[in-house]
Amino acid sequence: MSTIEFETIGSRLQSLEAKLQAQNESHDQIVLSGARGPVVSGSVPSARVPPLATSASAATSATHAPSLGAGSVSGSGISIAQRPAPPVPHATPFGSASASSSSSSASAFASAAPATGTFGGTYTPPTTRVSRATPTLPMLSSGPGGGLNRTRPVILPLPTPPHPPVSETDMKLKIIMEQTGKLNINGRQYPTDINDLKHLGDLGNGTSGNVVKMMHLSSNTIIAVKQMRRTGNAEENKRILMDLDVVLKSHDCKYIVKCLGCFVRDPDVWICMELMSMCFDKLLKLSKKPVPEQILGKVTVATVNALSYLKDKHGVIHRDVKPSNILIDERGNIKLCDFGISGRLVDSKANTRSAGCAAYMAPERIDPKKPKYDIRADVWSLGITLVELATARSPYEGCNTDFEVLTKVLDSEPPCLPYGEGYNFSQQFRDFVIKCLTKNHQDRPKYPELLAQPFIRIYESAKVDVPNWFQSIKDNRLRANGDPTLQRATATGSAIGSGAGSLAGSGSGSAGGAVKYGRATTYAGQSPTNPQKTIKPTQIPSYQQQQSQFFMQSATQLPQTTTTTPTATTNCFGGSGNGNGRGNGSGGSGNGSGSSSSASPLSPPSAGIGDLNRLYRKSPFMQRKLSNGSHHPHYKYNDESPKKESMFSSIGQSILRNLTTSPFSQKKHNSTATTIPLPHNNQTLITDAATAAAAAATATTPPNIAATVLTTTPTTTPTWRLPTENSQAYDSCDSSSNATTTTLNLGLSSPSPSLPRKQFPTESPTLQLTSQQQQQPQRLQPGNQSPIVLQRFYHQQNQLREKEAAERYQQQRQQPPVGVTSTNPFHSNYVPPPPSTHSTSSQSSTQSTCSQIAINPASISPSSGSGTGNMAGLGIGSAPASGLGAAGHFGAGGTGEQLQYQPLPIAAEATGTSPTLQSRSPEQQSDYGGNGNMVASKLSKLYARRQLLGQSSSSGASNSSLDGCSREQHDAGWFNTLAGAMKRQFATYVKTQLNSTATSPVASSMDRDQEPVHPQPPAYRSVVNNGSGGKSYYYRTLSAASSSSNTSQSTSPTTEPLPGGGTSSFLRRYASSGPGGSISTPPSPHILAGLDRRHRSPDPPPRYNRGQSPLLLRKNLLELSGQPPGSPLLHRRYVSASPPLPPPRRGSESVPGSPQHFRTRIHYTPEPQRRIYRTIDQ
């Protein structure tokens, strides 16, 4: 320690002693009243010293108030800090509180000014160390408690930061925390724990979190829960709280989504809201069509009112108005949601510009020169939203980046509603949009002006059936997806019939009931007992009811199939006792009617639901559809393989899209009353068809039989669905279980359900097509849509089919052909294929099931005799007359061939071959050949025709036989003869011809004519038959190979194809086309006629796993078909079982145990440059 420091400390101690001494000596002179001020004011930075003696020196004693700390005592205007006084040991660190009393004059203070105390570091020791006692000084400024009172604790005036004002966010959080865990549902408050919510599925996700569907167990209500993570991000937290704050306060606005409560937890925040069905963004993607102006009128009314409410009541601007934030529910309510980036308006202006979606952002929010904007920015967003919904595309859809969008918003003219192109918007709507999209925000109207616009005035009072429109969109989507939730009709069969239109019949008894929107079915399904039950209008959408209904329906439906009670009874939906199925026509009358009403495959007959499941279970298209009726209600895709599903989803979609839109896609069945194409009301069509079918059935069959059929259908085994009273409308396949029963019950008189259907034939197939297109367009199934997966699936299916075909062929060779003369141009002969064949391949299994069903009935039918022209005829030729008898399994009399995809051209050719063949009824038309109508039936079959598979046997069979048996039989012949053609077209043949063989209608007709008696080998029939046709067509269209001939599996009644005419389509195309005029080369089914050809883009060459190379397939094909061993075609090539496999694209794609797998492992090295074998996308 340096000498100076030592001296400093010493001097300070000395001065302290002097000060204490002076204090004690002058104690009696202290004025009590004067000294307390400084002490009391210890926490105040500058304490006022009460009036001191006029002598400035008196202030010295006042300075003893230690409590003053750093403050400056303004006694006589002199700051304590200016005094050179060593601090009291326990004084504040600032030390300025201790003042030296050694100087009695103001000058002493001045001289010591630099001193700041012990810790000040600038203390200048006084020149004199002698302390000056000041006993004579009046210490007015310090009272008894003043000065350095050792007994008084020192109050340290430590600098405490001013308490931050409570932020708006914190206040909101505090208010919200008080409400956490309290849910207000249906007017009642439930204290709820997060464990009381059961997760049902995801609804969607966005920037701030995800929205899930949950069941509130206490109230048994399904709600939507928005789950948002709580991050340390202040912006994110602010957004969450803003959203919560707005929805909690907006409970009194019917145009804003209701908040039922919230849970604020450490990791996340859950906002519980009423469940809405969907947002308009998703709706637009589903419908792929513009939203009608009437609906947009209601959307505008709701949105403008909601925005106006936010502004007027809460001073909030939404800032994110767009289709995805406008929700709709099944009751037609339209509401605004998502207030996460809403902003408070200060003086009606908002400041932040980062919030919102670029495409909907107003120009003033983008332009940096305009720092503030107001609610009119939301008006612009509303205008853009309306243009997008009205045209089904974004006005800025060409832009790839937000920057391009923003540039376009700023620099280009504002968007407007287009003219022409079928856009017929009212002038009021156009004017409204123009006002909303005024670029200069000063000229843009605010909410009061908008609410006075004629467009809003009109739709505030107009009655618009929003629920029905919304339901139709959902139904179309569900149909396309085969979505099980479209259980409406499916679940109850009758419901099916009711479809959207008839639902009324189903649950509500009145078309108008909630049911009319299609949901009713679901509910009806819930309690068969209470068909009248309508959706209960809770705030919470019917989803809550839906869940239970979903399973119940399945169960309910199943029983329906089993129930022996008459249709009326079974039909909880007012399927009405009428066997007619008109029973409530709309209701889809009972099972039977359900069946018939299910003109669309979407709605399988209710009675046959069980079988339907069975039949369709393997069909990728039908799986979902039937899931309701499935025996395992909880397993949506019964027995479906994921691979298949995925394949269908992608391929099915594309094919369906193409085919459904094409005339071919029509189902023949629809021809029944369904002639009226109801775009969205398949059910209606179905119902009509059902009614007509029922009528036809009744007419055709003896009254007692008709009644029996109707009643029994539900009861009878679903071996092959009877059309049930109305099944005529459906393919036999659809009604197969019922059909069988019915056929049997009917006895000979009405052996086949198709017979009644035949009557429908009167209507032109085209009409049916229309209906079908509408019904079928959506059978898409979600799943793995990878082309590779799908292709592999197809190839595997082809292989299976080929094997099956071979086996069947052998079996059939051994079986005597069933000779049945058939009036039908299509062969009536059905050779029942061994049931095993049907199920052999998964694809064919569905069809095969149908075909089996069809086949058995077919055999029965002919026996019944009523099946005019035999089942084989399937009522094609005679079906019109026999109606019932000909029904043929698939209700497509000999139309088995009528694969959905049968090329239209074939119909013409077939026509040439057998004009008679062309049946008026779609069912009669053969898919491939026989009829100009084939196209329609083709698609129908695609869906409903799976049933036809069996039937197609007659005409299809002939063709099919080419496919299946004849192919094998004639393979040697045609392979040898057509070696050149085969070489050129082998791959195509393998992939597509197998399918197409069945297609050639002409050949089949010729065959029919020439050899009606010969049954076709199942394999062929499979190809020919819709069996494979229905499915395979589907497949074919997707990938010709997929449906290989076996698919049909139906025993086509078709006689064996003649070598020339009967040859497989492939040969036919090449060899036959030249020689036989009669055989106009029928386009192969998968090669849709020229009309459809454009829809089918070539498949990329598939990558094969072991055993799947085309060469191997061909080898198997030739071997199976009995090709002579020395065939020039193969000989040299097949030294090894198959050519070396190409390396896999990725190691993960190789099959374990395959050569690629080994190679992958052996040659794997981390350095890419050394991957010798992996040059493909590695």
Swiss-Prot record:
UniProt-annotated stretches for the region Disordered: 74-103, 115-148, 522-648, 715-783, 797-851, 912-933, 999-1026, 1042-1108, 1122-1178
Pfam families the UniProt entry points to: Pkinase (PF00069)
PANTHER family the record matches: DUAL SPECIFICITY MITOGEN-ACTIVATED PROTEIN KINASE KINASE HEMIPTEROUS, MITOGEN-ACTIVATED PROTEIN KINASE KINASE 5
Its job: Required for the epithelial cell sheet movement called dorsal closure (DC), which allows establishment of the dorsal epidermis. Controls the expression in the dorsal epithelium edges of another dorsal closure gene, puckered (puc). Phosphorylates and activates the MAP kinase bsk; bsk signal transduction pathway mediates an immune response and morphogenesis.
Biased composition regions of type Low complexity, renumbered to the chain: 91-103, 115-128, 544-570, 594-608, 735-783, 808-817, 837-851, 1042-1055
Catalytic activity: L-seryl-[protein] + ATP = O-phospho-L-seryl-[protein] + ADP + H(+); L-threonyl-[protein] + ATP = O-phospho-L-threonyl-[protein] + ADP + H(+); L-tyrosyl-[protein] + ATP = O-phospho-L-tyrosyl-[protein] + ADP + H(+)
UniProt biased composition (Polar residues): 523-543, 724-734, 912-928
Keyword Protease appears in the UniProt entry: no
Residue positions, PTM Phosphoserine: S348, S646, S662, S1150, S1154
Basic and acidic residues composition-biased segments: 636-646, 1168-1178
EC top class, as a word: transferase
Modification Phosphothreonine, positions: T352
Protein name: Dual specificity mitogen-activated protein kinase kinase hemipterous
EC number(s) stated in the UniProt entry for this protein: 2.7.12.2
Residue positions of the active site: D320 (proton acceptor)
Similarity section: Belongs to the protein kinase superfamily. STE Ser/Thr protein kinase family. MAP kinase kinase subfamily.
Residues in Protein kinase domain copies: 197-456
SMART domains in the record: S_TKc
GO molecular function terms listed in the Swiss-Prot or TrEMBL record: ATP binding; JUN kinase kinase activity; MAP kinase kinase activity; MAP-kinase scaffold activity; protein kinase activity; protein kinase binding; protein serine kinase activity; protein serine/threonine kinase activity
Keywords of the record: ATP-binding, Developmental protein, Kinase, Nucleotide-binding, Phosphoprotein, Serine/threonine-protein kinase, Transferase, Tyrosine-protein kinase
Single Gene Ontology BP annotation: imaginal disc eversion
Keyword Lipid metabolism: no
Post-translational modification: MAPKK is itself dependent on Ser/Thr phosphorylation for activity catalyzed by MAP kinase kinase kinases. Weakly autophosphorylated.
InterPro entries: Dual_spec_MAPK_kinase, Kinase-like_dom_sf, Prot_kinase_dom, Protein_kinase_ATP_BS, Ser/Thr_kinase_AS
Skewed-composition ranges (Gly residues): 574-593
CDD domains xrefs: PKc_MKK7
